[in-house]
Amino acid sequence: MSATRSQRSSTISPARPRRSPATIPMKRPETPSSSHFSASPVTSSSPLLRSSPSPSTSSAAASSTAVASTKLKENITVTIRFRPLSPREVNNGDEIAWYADGDYTIRNEYNPSLCYGFDRVFGPPTTTRRVYDIAAQQVVSGAMSGINGTVFAYGVTSSGKTHTMHGEQRSPGIIPLAVKDVFSIIQETPEREFLLRVSYLEIYNEVINDLLDPTGQNLRIREDSQGTYVEGIKDEVVLSPAHALSLIASGEEHRHVGSNNVNLFSSRSHTMFTLTIESSPHGKGDDGEDVSLSQLHLIDLAGSESSKTEITGQRRKEGSSINKSLLTLGTVISKLTDTKAAHIPYRDSKLTRLLQSTLSGHGRVSLICTITPASSTSEETHNTLKFAQRCKHVEIKASRNKIMDEKSLIKKYQKEISCLQEELTQLRHGNQDDLADRKLQVKLQSRLEDDEEAKAALMGRIQRLTKLILVSTKSSLQAASVKPDHIWRQAFGEDELAYLPDRRRENMADDGAVSTVSEHLKEPRDGNSSLDEMTKDRRKNKTRGMLGWLKLKKSDGVAGTLPTDGNQSQASGSPSSSSKYTQTKTTRRENAAAIKSIPEKTVAGDLFSATVGPEDSSPTGTTIADQMDLLHEQTKILVGEVALRTSSLNRLSEQAARNPEDFHIRDQIQKLEDEISEKKDQIRVLEQQIIEIFGMTPYASDSLGMPQVLSKLTMQLNEKIFEHEIKSADNRILQEQLQMTKSENAEMQETIILLRQQLDSLAERQSTQQIAGDESSGKNIHNRNGEESEIYSGAGTPTSVMSLNRVFAQEETKEIYNETALNSQALEIENLKKEKMRLIEEKDELGKLNKKLTEEASYAKELASAAAVELQNLAEEVTRLCNENAKLSR
């Protein structure tokens, strides 16, 4: 008696006094529900109410869980969870009306004979993890093996249903623990592969809403061979626990909640979180391999409400809908326990319609009833216990679900993966034909890039030399300065014609003379003296041309006998300009030594030496502009030569790296380096001359003349840039044609070499066979005593054994050649197959690496999204706690 007393007091708050109970017999009393079904005393063999096992038998019952799960029939697992008295109930003076008598019995404080027995009773100190291990873990394990499972919480409002199912950050509820347990089971089952989908809905005022898709409102319930389902519900495939929990958190944001006088945050709707589990053997199985399909329903029911909640308006309508659905649920449970019931009203509410497959026995069911021990809600608690007692008598038959049709999503994905793999294989076979062409293109592209710089420099040099030979504006500018109405054509001299063929040189000289005379005749007759003088000068300098004129100016400049010096100095009228010009002439004479060092063999050297020019000539704007143009062209030519020699130097350096003992290559490298340094010195001298010529212009101090010179130079620069762009485009086209021609020539050379080798080998074989045939024919003739040695002369046809042997040898040679060609082709095909297999393996490895990186990236994104959701939940929880603290402090 004392032992029983101490056990009861351990589950009751010590701060609450209670009356001493009446004398209680040692055996287990009958419950009100059991007396309704049977008048005999309750025993352990009663089919309607299982008695509470003794401590000695509890361990045996726990150890035989696996055996019990294999039975054909079993009952709904019913557990009860007490919550402690709330501060509001304590302040109102409520006392404890119901308490847990051990782990399997609940008794009434005021009527100890009123007691109920269940599969497990949890007191207030019990954690949610302990509740999950006993009440829900077996259901979750069965769902992973293909057996449907349902876990739902039932109780009055503010009894702790949502706390039990969802929990909080420090104490997760049944739903988070089940999700984590599912992924743990997947990790520990490597022989099977799984596909998980989740859906989340609510039943609000008898209307089904999709919490994962806010646009899914007022959904309809349908039925097929697998059972009932919601049409149009969103199924989201999940890959990790964080992903699933983030979906739950997003769905909770759309759930309907409200407040009443007993609960600040009261659920105003039933919610059902469904986890659809598909599994099949890992790897590629047979086509007839079955797929397990099961659903795990985790349901948080809204609490039944009485008139004590004092709700009005919309809250009253919500409470009415909640009570109606819960009443229908109770009616369905009662009909299921009545063997004589002909009709079960599943369709009277949306909740029972969704639970039709579950309650009709297709799967395991665990009911967690949450109750409060407060005396103010004693009647509601009693009704909850009676509902739980009725549920305990519902029989179910759990069986593994298998689907053989095409409704399995995992089968659909597997077939799609197989189709994609076949397409990938076909693409690999198709791409093998293009690999050789692509490799050849890569090689040609690399060779083109190597030679591009040298070719560009060479083409640029050709263009600049062409411009220097064919274009001259010097004489026309001088003629325009003397008489603007007269325009003279510049004739080519012997120096320019030396670069042309003999026939073209004669034609050009004759054309120049004729054109000069014709232009004289076309001009008006005024200014005869000036024209005569200009004609004499032109005939005198006719054979010199531009280069000869420059050389003549050079000799005149050295003598210093030009009469225009004094005029120019007097015309300037400025001592500063005169002294500046004198200083410039002195500087240019000092650079004469450096100028003479430039070789005269090249065109650049001739033009460079010609620019020593008229040291004492008048520095007019046109003269200086022409000299600067000429110096710029010479600089470009030298730069092109430097680029060409640099490219040659790079190639020789590569050859020297391959053949370090070749002294001839080293000598060539040293020679090229000396030439490059010499060209660079010449470029520096030309740049210095350009600067000096620009400084000696008479417009340096005249602000009116300088813009004209600059505008002229700008126009010339634009014209040359345009010409350069056009010729660059032509150059690119020519380079492409040249490259194509080179590749064709290389292929033809390779073919010719191969044919020559084959011809040589055939000739050797033919000669060998001919010698062997001669020897054999000689032996045959000797054995036949000369009878066969006669030669019958005919009309050019072979009449001896030797001739016949030659014919046979030719036929054998053809056969050998054909056999050799076939062998070479077979060997080439074998090499191509090996190369193909190697490329396929490399592509597979790259595909695996890409897939791995993609999975890691998706997993990182999921973790980031889950972390963001957790942070948001924490922020909301902090806000809620702050609000509660503020209200409590008031």
Swiss-Prot record:
Coiled coil: 395-468, 664-693, 729-765, 818-884
Segments for region (Disordered): 1-66, 511-595, 768-797
PANTHER family per record: CENTROMERE PROTEIN E, KINESIN-LIKE PROTEIN KIN-7C, MITOCHONDRIAL ISOFORM X1
Pfam families cross-referenced by the UniProt entry: Kinesin
Organism (species): Arabidopsis thaliana (Mouse-ear cress)
Entry's family note: Belongs to the TRAFAC class myosin-kinesin ATPase superfamily. Kinesin family. KIN-7 subfamily.
GO BP annotations, alphabetical order: microtubule-based movement
Polar residues bias: start-end ranges: 1-13
Keywords associated with the record: ATP-binding, Coiled coil, Microtubule, Mitochondrion, Motor protein, Nucleotide-binding, Transit peptide
GO CC annotation: microtubule; mitochondrion
SMART domains recorded: KISc
Gene transcribed to yield this protein: KIN7C
Protein name as annotated: Kinesin-like protein KIN-7C, mitochondrial
Gene3D superfamilies: Kinesin motor domain
Every Kinesin motor domain range: 75-394
